[in-house]
Each structure stands twice: as C-alpha cells, then as structure tokens.
C-alpha cells in the first residue's frame, strides 16, 4: 500500500498551532510581582514588545516564577521593568506544561533562552564559573 492512503495524526503540530493561537490571543500585562495566578503553566516575557524569553512554571507557580523574573530585572542595570510585559497561559497537566514550553521556544526562538537569563544552574556565581551573556549585558546594580 502506498503512503498516500495512510493517515498519521501529527499531534505536535496540532498542539503547537492551538497553543500559539491561544497564547497570542491572551492579553499582555506589565511584568509585576502579582501579575499571574498561583497556578502552573507557560509564559513569555517581552522587552519593548519583542518576545525575549519563554518558560514554564511547573515546580512553582506562574505568580512566583514571574515575580522572580521581575525582581531579577529590577535589580539590573541597562534594563527596567517599564520595558517589560508578559503573557501566560495556565495549564494543569505536567506533560502539557513541558510540551507548551517546548512549543513556545521552538516557535519563537527567544534570545534570552540562549543567554542564561532563566538559569538556576548550580554553582552560578561561584569563583571560576563564567558569567552568562545575560549577566554581562545586564549586570547587577
């Protein structure tokens, strides 16, 4: 039998398309410590209207994760919270949160996802550990 008669549902494409559609329809909010609900999900940060970081809140809540990012940015030079907005979607399932983060990163290729912005790497800041590009561009105050 030829492949033209076979049906294969491409779940990842359908999931990504629906997630991005819902995500882009969600409102943008100023990045503050209380912007999001205490639920799990996915989010993106925008600087001056440009999507710069996509992440997930799984072991913590969207509220805590976005508050952590707001505090980090507020404590840096060359950037301010006035420049920042965010979008988020609440998602209950661990699998869908992980898949959602992957879909956002793959779809948007955010610059800060490659610079160490959201890093929780053990040893960061210790002697002998190189500073991330993000820490170099936006040093602590």
Kindly give the residue locations of the regions a language model identified:
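Boundary/linker segments flanking structured domains
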Residues: 1-52, 56-141
């Amino acid at each position: 039998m030829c492949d033209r008669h076979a049906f294969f549902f491409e779940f990842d494409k359908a999931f990504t398309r629906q997630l991005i559609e819902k995500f882009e329809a969600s409102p943008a909010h100023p990045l503050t410590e209380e912007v999001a609900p205490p639920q799990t999900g996915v989010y993106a940060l925008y600087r001056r209207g440009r999507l710069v970081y996509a992440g997930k809140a799984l072991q913590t809540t969207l509220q805590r994760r976005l508050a952590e990012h707001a505090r980090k940015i507020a404590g840096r030079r060359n950037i301010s919270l006035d420049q920042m907005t965010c979008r988020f979607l609440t998602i209950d399932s661990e699998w869908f949160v992980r898949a959602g983060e992957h879909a956002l990163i793959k779809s948007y290729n955010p610059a800060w996802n490659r610079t160490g912005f959201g890093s929780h790497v053990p040893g960061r800041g210790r002697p002998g550990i190189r500073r991330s590009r993000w820490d170099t561009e936006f040093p602590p105050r």
